[in-house]
Amino acid sequence: YSQYLVWQDIIRDEYYIVEAVGTGIHITTLAALALHNDYIAAVRPIFDASKISQAIEATLSLLGREYDFGLNYYSDVSYVCSALITKAYLPNETWSVWLHIELERIATGIVYPPNSLVRKMAYDQLSQRSELWFVAFVDAREKDQRSFFSCEQQFLLSWKRSRLSFFLD
C-alpha cells in the first residue's frame, strides 16, 4: 500500500496525488500512480473541512522534500509515504483532534506502516470509534494479472496478508 493525498482537477477531469517515493515528495496523477502500485486504497479522515484543508496545505508545503530512506518518522527533513499523510493529521497549535497512531520499529527505523493504518481501521470499526472512512480499494490478483475494485471488508482484512501473498495466489 501507499498513502496519498488526492484532489480532482475538474477542468481536466484528472485526479492528482501527493506522494512520497524514492525520488522525493511530488505530485502525480492517479493514472500514473496506478501503474506502479499493486494495491490502491482511498480513505478519508472523519474531521471537519477546515482541518482537512489545513492538512492538505501542510502536505503541499512539503513538495520537493526528500524520501526518508532511513525510516525516521521524527524527521521533518524527509518523509516516507505513510509519514507524509499521518503527520498532516497530528496535533498542532490550531487543533487538538488528530489521528491516533502507534509508531513501530522496523529494522533500525521508526515508522507508521500503511498496513498498520488498515489494521487500525479494522479494529476501530469493531469498537465503533472510527477516525477514517473507507472510500475505495483496488485489489490485485497476480495469478490472473489483473486489478479490480474490491469491498471494504476485503480491504479491512488485507493487512493480514503476507507481503508475498501475490506470489501465493
Locations of regions flagged by a protein language model:
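Generic structural signal for short, flexible, solvent-exposed coil/loop and linker residues
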Residues: 6-7, 31, 56, 106, ...
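Residue-level detector of flexible, active-site-proximal loop/helix-junction positions
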Residues: 24, 49, 105
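Activation targets extended, charge/polar-rich intrinsically disordered C-terminal tails
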Residues: 72-169
